[in-house]
Amino acid sequence: TQQLTLKRDYDFAVTFFALNTWTGSSTGNDIVPGNKWDTANGDPIKDIRKEIRAMKKKTGIKPNKMVYGAAAWDVVLDNPAVIDRIKYGQSSPNNPAFTNEQTIAAILGLEQIVVADIVYNTSEEGAADSMDFIFTEDSALLLYAAATPGILMPSAGYIFTWRQYLASTSGLRIMRMRNDLARSDRIEGEMAYAMKIVASDLGVLFKTVDT
């Protein structure tokens, strides 16, 4: 099951974190911050808010979610402009002022922030392990994702699943079968889905956000 879900995450990253795919930004292209987010003059909140306005102005729809690569999220947490916004927050020994996904989502007016820090082994079977992040580390995707799917419901993208075949809304099925002759159980997993960008103007990809 873990290997299948890793494959699904990999396909998601390849599809939705692809370069030169999204057009919802102020430039119509991917955004490279003029001041990197790990520098003294970098301000991820200002940069992201600019693109939130740009998408709203272009489409009439305000983005509601953001997905960060591991390094992109780390530089946001350590960014002086971000720290300055929350350093006077209420704190106690049991509830210190800190920055997490909910804090940044609240500042940006987003419903959800996801940190995509999933790791996989890139080497061939039997070779020495070569571990890496599935999602591009220094990138972040700002997007609008519909709460519920619908033919007339705008959304940056959808994951279409073959539910009649798998009898599963997730597009994943695990089967366990007994082989009495071999005195063993056979476990099979299969997936049937397609990941598609359906509205490229409802997404903005930030890339190379750190130095």
Regions found by a protein language model. Name each.
Residues 1-62, 70-92, 208-211:
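Alpha-helical scaffold segments that mediate packing/assembly in large oligomeric complexes
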Residues 31-43, 83-211:
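Sequence/fold signature of self-assembling virion shell proteins
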Residues 65-69, 114-115:
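A structural signal for short, well-ordered beta-strand segments and their strand-loop junctions
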Residues 68-70, 144-145:
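Short His-Asn-centered micro-motif
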